[in-house]
Amino acid sequence: MKKVLASATILSLMLVGCSNGGNDESSHKDDSSKTEQKDKSSSQHDSKKDSKRNDTNNKQDNQENKSNKEQTSNQNSNAGEQRTSERPTTNSNGISSDNQNKQQQSVQDNQNKYVAPYQSENATRVARYLSPFEGDRSQALQQLPNFETALSIAKNEANMYGSENKSYNDYSIEQTEDGFRYVFSFKDPSKSNTYSIVTLNRQGQPTVVDPNFQP
């Protein structure tokens, strides 16, 4: 009888031990599963963070590339504008800035070359008749443009009316409210005894007073 009880007790203890072992194994499996899920979730989270970081970096790279392209485009545009601005401009009369610069240089060259005022050979007293000058000629000439330059400007102005081949005849000086001015006469070869009268002030501005003067 005692042996039977002892056997029953041992069997009962074995069953309890097996039950506890099963519970421990099940608990261990649950813990392992939770750990794997946690690791998997963490890995997915890290992957999402990396993906998001890559997207951000790509956006920044795209913005930098776009900014570089815009900067390059602006530089090219500015360079084109600069090249355009360096080209000779043309005014409404079709005269380029280069030609104007050459004309100004020619005027300056003539001013640097002093030529004493003179009458033409066998000149008729026309300008001297219209404007006889009795003042200080040296003082007046100091206030007026170079004679050769003034004569060239006045002749070009005279040739704009009637014949374009007028010849220089004579000159005089006339006193005005603001100083002095030249008075030139140019003979018109297409008309008998006809002269063009042109004045030129201190600023070098010509004025045709009479394109068909007959003394």
Curated annotation (Swiss-Prot):
Q: Where is the lipid attached (N-palmitoyl cysteine)?
A: C18
GO CC aspect terms: plasma membrane
At the top level, the lineage of the source is: Bacteria
Q: Where is the lipid attached (S-diacylglycerol cysteine)?
A: C18
What subcellular locations does the record give? Cell membrane
Q: According to the UniProt entry, which residue ranges have a biased composition of type Basic and acidic residues?
A: 25-69
Q: Tell me what topology the record assigns in the membrane.
A: Lipid-anchor
* Polar residues biased stretches: 70-95
Tell me the keywords, alphabetical order. Answer: Cell membrane, Lipoprotein, Membrane, Palmitate, Signal
Leader sequence range is: 1-17
Predominant place of localization: membrane
Region Disordered: which residues? Answer: 17-110
* Compositional bias annotation for Low complexity: 96-110
Kindly list the residue ranges recorded as spanning the membrane. none
Q: What is this protein called?
A: Uncharacterized lipoprotein SE_1947
**From what organism does this protein derive?**
Staphylococcus epidermidis (strain ATCC 12228 / FDA PCI 1200)
Source lineage = Bacteria, Bacillati, Bacillota, Bacilli, Bacillales
